[in-house]
């Protein structure tokens, strides 16, 4: 597990979203307050100008500014390229020119596999930014394939049903 985690960790980032949210007071008035949300991302592609990072739509929704923190704890601005509310996925990009050479040496594009070959009972390794405390690694097993899960989008209130891979590995607990 530690060898696989060491291989993958340079591809994992923390995404910080700063947004403005309308909140109601006890007296019926509303005000706009800054809010911060955190999530994980994975570097999945690079071209001559940008790194591309996959994250969750709910992490970047309503963003006023995005910050991406790499495994060397250096942060740069990110920009949303696209989102998909139904799958809760988003892609953000980071300018390569904004990265220090030391950061460029510390990170890498992830090697992605295929979920087509997964089997129930196989070991699963989950890596992510657990509750904003930094990178965490946990293990479990593939519990189910094609598990239908209904998810309600926090922003739109729409409910979507997706087929998911269920694992017993929890990174946020």
Regions found by a protein language model. Name each.
Residues 1-173:
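Serine-dependent protease modules
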